[in-house]
Amino acid sequence: MAVLENLEPKKVFHFFEEISEVPRGTFNIKGISDYCTKFAKDRNLEVVQDEVGNVVIKKPGTTGYENSAPVILQGHMDMVCEKRPDSNHDFTKDPLELQIVDGNVVAKDTTLGGDNGIALAMAMALLDSCLLYTSPSPRDGATSR
């Protein structure tokens, strides 16, 4: 059972849990960079991954919005890697052990990597979503799909 599966918004926490499976300390971002690239390719999104691991994913506007100004969502992929002195966690290869303690998402004996891990998860949830407006404009009473 996924630790975060009952949290809302579901897609955000789903992707955050997946991201937490990938070691992503500073200067160790190849795995998370590859994960983000695969995410985009699996959804037929335009993606560029450069030689240092930066990833840019583009999703076209929906019907009626093809020529609208783009929206940029940004988050860094790495995390601060700190652990309790008695922890055997190896940030170069071990996934984070997520837990819910007193209603808060935490990682067992380590930092959570939540500051921008959640930014990545939110961006991925939006890129994965069908909740994008189509023509006509939502101001005209259109529904989202």
What is each stretch, according to the model?
Residues 125-132:
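Flexible, small-residue-rich helix->loop connector segments that border functional cores
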Residues 106-112:
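Short pre-catalytic strand/loop immediately N-terminal to key active-site residues, enriched for Gly-Thr
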Residues 4-102:
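Acidic/His- and Gly-rich active-site-bordering loop/insert found
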Residues 115-122:
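Catalytic-loop motifs flanking and including active-site residues across diverse enzymes
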Residues 26, 112-113:
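Short acidic-aromatic active-site loops that bind/stabilize oxyanions
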Residues 133-140:
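Conserved small/polar residues in nucleotide/adenosyl-binding loops
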Residues 52, 110, 139:
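An acidic- and aromatic-residue-enriched active-site/binding cleft used to recognize and process polar
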Residues 142-145:
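N-terminal low-complexity segments that are often proline-rich with Ser/Thr-Pro
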